[in-house]
Each structure stands twice: as structure tokens, then as C-alpha cells.
Amino acid sequence: MSSFQQENQLNANNNNNNVMNEYISYSVPLSPVTTNENPQDYWMNGLIANSVPISQTTSNSDINYSQPPNPINFNSIFEGVNIFSNDDFTSSSNDISLANSPETNATSDSIAQNLDEVKVKLENHNQARLDALEFAFETKSILKEQPKIKQEPGTKAATKPKRRAPRKKLTESQKKAHNKIEKRYRININAKIAGIQKIIPWVAFEKTAFETGEENETEAEAKNNTRLNKSMILEKATEYILHLQKKEEEYMAENQKLREQVIKLGGEI
């Protein structure tokens, strides 16, 4: 082998040693794992071993490492189940998972299409519920009735007073017919009052001051101007009725006395 080849091989070996030394200097030793160790303690011990600074010396011959500190027992911390069953822990983990989840690159067309589909489904669902309510309660007109605007008490429409229709003026023929009808009613009432007058003995032959429809009224009016009106006749009729009631009571008392006398004498009634 030539001297040039030996020199190249020596340089290659030196380079390999340098690479290995650099690799060993940047590597971090892990604590030994024992089979009897708890997995939670092993995880925490590894975390502490990686986080604690380690003094290292690199050389071509040997590597010296400082021993990690004694592992801390975390069994007492993790024995409680409430740490992992807390709602805040669950909600925070869900938020972190949502934040770390990859975003979907949805296009605007697909989003618009999805929104249209959701709107159509909501409309169909609402219509189905409305139809079900109408069928169950028979309130179709009530459900579809538009809300009416409520008027405030202060804004009530002023009610206009109703105007009476103007009276039509009667013609001459209508006036004559109306007067004849009223005269007939008046004469009928006067005749009834005149009949009461004839029942009363002390005014039966007196003349009346009102028209009764008799033929000799004009002749009697010329002979005697003093006449009885309707109020006077009604007053006399009331006095006469009271007089008759009093006489009836007297007759009843006298009749009772006569019956008692007949019974005393041994007669029969």
C-alpha cells in the first residue's frame, strides 16, 4: 500500500471518530427501567432526567455522566381519580384537541351548497311540525293568522255620532190622513170616558167638554156652556168606586147580624 493511500485512510478514521464523539456529546442518557417500577414513576423520572442539566465530558477514550437525582414518587398525586374526572380538565382537553385539529380547506361553493341544504331541511321540518299541530288541534286558521297590530288606548279612533235622517215633509193629503187617524183615536178614548160618566149617578147627565162622537153635541153646547172635562170625570169615578166599597162592607156586617139572630130564634139558614 502506498503512503498516499495510508494517509487518506488515516484521515477517514479521524473523521469517523470526530462524528461519533459529537453524536455521543449530544445524546442524553435515560434512567434505567426496572420491571418493578410503576409506569407513572417511570414517565415522571424520564421527564426529570431530560429536564435536569447534565455535566458531560467528551473524549476519545471514555464518557462520564453525572447521575440523575433521586426520582420523586408521584403515586400520591395520581392516586385520586378526581384529577382526571374533572369537568374542567375534560373541557380544556377538548378545546386543545379542537385547536390542534387540522383545518379543512372548504371552498366557498361547497359551503354555500351545504347552507342551502340546511335551510331546505329546516323549512321542511318546520312545515311538518306546523301540519302536525294543525291536524292535532284543528287550529289551522289560528296558527296561520297574521299578528294583528294592537291599538294603544290613547290612539282610539273617535266615534262619530250618528246623524238622524231628516224628516220628510208631509204633503197636504198625508197631513189630512194623519189628522183623521189621530181624531179617530181621540174620539174612541173620549167615548170610553163618557161611558164611565154615565155610571156615576150625580154626574151622569152632565155635559162633557170633549168630543164623544154623539149627534146632539152641537145642540147641548148651545144650551149649557158648563161642561165636564176628562180629569173631572175620572175623579168622580174614583169617589164613586170608594163609596161602593164602603157600602159593601156595611151590607156585609148587617147581613152577618141578621144571620146570628135567625140562628138564635132556631131557624135554619
From Swiss-Prot:
Example GO BP: single-species biofilm formation on inanimate substrate
Major location category of this protein: nucleus
SMART domains: HLH
Occurrences of domain bHLH (ranges): 173-244
Up-regulation conditions: Expression is controlled by RTG1 and is down-regulated during mating process, yeast-to-hyphal transition, and in presence of benomyl, amphotericin B, and caspofungin.
Keyword presence, Protein transport: no
Basic residues bias: start-end ranges: 159-168
InterPro entries: bHLH_dom (IPR011598), HLH_DNA-bd_sf (IPR036638), Regulatory_TF_Diverse (IPR052099)
Annotated keywords: Carbohydrate metabolism, Nucleus, Transcription, Transcription regulation, Virulence
Subcellular locations according to the entry: Nucleus
Chain positions covered by the region annotation Disordered: 146-178
One annotated GO molecular function: protein dimerization activity
UniProt key word Transcription: yes
Compositionally biased intervals (Basic and acidic residues): 169-178
GO cellular component terms given for this protein: chromatin; nucleus
Pfam families the UniProt entry points to: HLH
Summary of subunit composition and partner proteins: Efficient DNA binding requires dimerization with another bHLH protein.
Protein function: Key transcriptional regulator of carbohydrate metabolism. Binds the promoter sequences of the glycolytic genes at the CANNTG motif and activates their expression during growth on either fermentable or non-fermentable carbon sources as well as under hypoxic growth conditions. Complete glycolytic activation by GAL4 and TYE7 is required for full virulence. Involved in biofilm formation and negatively regulates hyphal formation under hypoxia. Also controls the expression of the copper transport protein CTR1.
PANTHER family, per the entry: SERINE-RICH PROTEIN TYE7, TRANSCRIPTION FACTOR HMS1-RELATED
Name of the protein this chain belongs to: Carbohydrate metabolism regulator TYE7
Organism expressing this protein natively: Candida albicans (strain SC5314 / ATCC MYA-2876)
Organism classification: Eukaryota, Fungi, Dikarya, Ascomycota, Saccharomycotina
